[in-house]
Amino acid sequence: MDRDEMWARANSHPMPWDMIIIGGGATGVGVAIDAASRGYDVLLLEQHDFGKGTSSRSTKLAHGGVRYLGQGNIGLVKDALRERGLLLQNAPHIVREIPFIVPNYDWWEAPFYGLGLKLYQLLAGKYGLGTSRILSRDEMLRFLPTLKTEGLRSGTVYYDGQFDDARLLIHMVATAYEQGAVLLNYVEVIGLTKSDAGTINGVKARNMETGDEIHASAKVVINATGAFSDNVRRLVDPNASSMILPSQGIHLVLAGSFLASGSAIMVPSTRDGRVLFAIPWHNHTLVGTTDTPLDNATLEPVAREEEIDFILATAGEYLATRPTREDVLSVFAGIRPLVRAKSKSTTAALSRDHVVHVDQSGLISVMGGKWTTYRHMAEDCVDQAAVMGELQQRPCITPGLPIHGSAGDPQTRSTLSLYGSDAAKIRQLIRDDTKLGELLHPMLPYLRAEVVWAVRNELARTVEDVLARRTRALFLNARASVAIAPVVADIIAAELHWQQSVRDKHLSSFNDLAANYLLS
């Protein structure tokens, strides 16, 4: 994928587009895949990088949502379990099945959670994974040798999906591109245009790198900006009521030795009513999450001290080695774009159902939902958009549409396995220049070749793009990422022909950002 080529296409494309999508997270890119694969002309604009917001900051789970069973939302769980199955089918190089263990310390927990998780398994139907069952104390410790043993009676095992969110997203961008969509990062929508009848018929947008502007018309404009959906709606109506209730969740990343296992821990009920996970991820341990209501969404949310303390304390109740602040390699925060529901008193109680909302102006906003259900959200949105835009009705094909790279061997678990079929091309880069086969840092699994690949083929434009989202270095080890940032900046500078001052500016910006991921 080449950004300059897509910018040229955006400028020369005959007007109007069938659909213009604002927002380059999982929802927006999912809509682009669905619409383009139906044969519609699609332009997607993202003012920062793909996945800069919520979509790179999830708990990395492709799951039905165990806690929604407790809320009685059987429909949501069943739908999400189907979508989990489709993700495993269509992106086997990125999404995988792993065991989750529920430790039982009271006599009633084994039958209670065992029954609930059996229902969870049954709701998946033909998309089910492994069989859930009750484990003895000894079996528990074989699954999770680092589990706290004091008072441990038994456990329950069930199976769910895990993935790398930002890696899946960039492969989704490539999928949409292959289906004919034009997708541009670092292009900000600065205004919406209206017809004489007062309906939205296009956008004004600015290329953040060059300052150039374009006016693009469309039969339908779709707002897929997640936690920032209300901001876009207010470009049309400054007095539009809020539909999004943002909630912050944080995650801590620890060394892999805290789990020393390919299995995850699931704590069904924490003090704030959420589920807490400790998950093996890229040979590290990911622990989260919290639920902190926010007044406003921010692009770069920061973990609060009380959230950090809560995660450490709760994890310490289940792990044999109690983690401390000194053990935290990285901390990151994400914002859930929950749709407001007046009858709910806490964000932890809100559902993750999605909404496709049409303003009087004709602006379509797709809101809510969660990562696992992005495909279904997109299908519903495109169905509505086709009606609004008076487009020819065409069936959705995404249930069986493979995600870019899926032709690779999902059984191969090398450092490049997440690239799927692209891994062979990265290995060719290394054969052409053996220096590219060097690790960027001994504590991280990433190669110099991955930086080159990200810039040449995955629309990476900054040091942050590479270290936060094309690789996950910043999320795995913030201090190591700061150490390798100058080398990464040099590689990008050579690829994009940056002047020294531009290189230094990008490096400084990344170092400022990385400070938010460090505890000490």
Predicted features and spans:
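Extreme N-terminal leader/targeting segments of oxidoreductases
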Residues: 1-19, 34-38
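Glycine-rich FAD pyrophosphate-binding loop
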Residues: 36-57
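Core beta-strand elements of the Rossmann-like FAD/NAD(P) dinucleotide-binding domain
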Residues: 14-17, 210-220
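C-terminal accessory subdomains/tails of enzymes that are appended
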Residues: 16, 20, 48, 94, ...
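Dinucleotide-binding Rossmann-like beta1-alpha1 core, especially the glycine-rich loop
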Residues: 60-143, 276, 411-412
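N-terminal Rossmann-fold NAD(P) dinucleotide-binding loop
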Residues: 28-29
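A conserved short coil-to-beta-strand element within the FAD-binding core of flavoproteins
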Residues: 185-201
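Short hydrophobic core segments
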Residues: 21-22, 216-226
